[in-house]
Regions:
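Primarily secretory-pathway and cell-envelope proteins
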Residues: 1-37, 60-138, 161-228
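A short beta-strand element within beta-rich, extracytoplasmic domains
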Residues: 3, 50-61, 151-162
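A glycine-anchored, Pro-Gly-centered beta-turn/N-cap motif
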Residues: 40-42, 46-54, 141-143, 147, ...
Length: 228
């Protein structure tokens, strides 16, 4: 049973039992549906990029971290134990994570070359909100760029255009920033090609650049496109 309290003539508290199905009716009014997506390197805000729900995650390709800003997830994903075999450490990473509730506003981050299948059966898809940003697309080459001076602060998708090198934010925040190697995934020798596939990415989703953040770009050219 559930109870509510009321004052009796302003002098005392009277506890009145009410029916236990009230909260159930409230919960049943929430619309949910099956939701699936593939997550690659980037940040994903629950309620904007993916819906609130209880998720399962499965590695599809590559290796990297899957973390959340609330501390509920902090895992290394390693598809088919590729990195584990390379460094000779058993159980270096995982390929699967189940029954993880994600609440509104949580930031989920995927790093490096990892591709993760994410899905839930109770996704509150109808509650997803757009960012509604009024930002411009911009191309940037080698150098240091400040949000607020060289481009507007906001959330951007990063696309590699040319070169091979590192891109990072300063100060670096794992929940909003970037520290990745971007470049071409082609090589002459098979061994070098395999190494490239484990290191280089060509896109990064939803990089959050706040006023005063510095974007450091080394030996590559990239494009910033406003995230939707």
């Amino acid at each position: 049973k559930y109870y509510s309290t009321h004052r009796n003539n302003g002098d005392s508290i009277v506890t009145i039992p009410i029916q236990g199905h009230v909260s159930e009716n409230i919960e049943s009014s929430i619309e949910t549906e099956v939701f699936t997506t593939t997550l690659t390197a980037g940040h994903y805000i629950v309620g904007i990029d993916i819906p609130v729900g209880t998720y399962s995650f499965f590695s599809k390709k590559g290796s990297g971290n899957l973390i959340s800003d609330d501390g509920s997830i902090n895992e290394i994903f390693d598809y088919e134990s590729q990195v584990s075999s390379d460094i000779g450490i058993e159980n270096f990473g995982t390929e699967e994570l189940n029954n993880i509730p994600l609440t509104d506003g949580t930031i989920l981050t995927v790093t490096s070359t990892q591709e993760i299948s994410a899905g839930c059966e109770d996704g509150r898809v109808s509650e997803l909100k757009p960012r509604n940003q009024e930002l411009n697309e911009i191309e940037l080459g080698y150098g240091l760029y400040a949000a607020g001076d060289d481009f507007d602060p906001g959330t951007y998708n990063v696309t590699w255009l040319e070169g091979n090198g590192n891109i990072q934010t300063n100060p670096y925040d794992s929940d909003t920033g970037i520290n990745e190697i971007m470049g071409e995934k082609t090589a002459t020798y098979d061994e070098l090609q395999e190494l490239n596939n484990k290191l280089y990415i060509r896109s990064f989703n939803n990089l959050i650049l706040n006023e005063g953040d510095i974007l450091e770009i080394n030996d590559i050219k990239i494009k910033l496109t406003p995230s939707k």
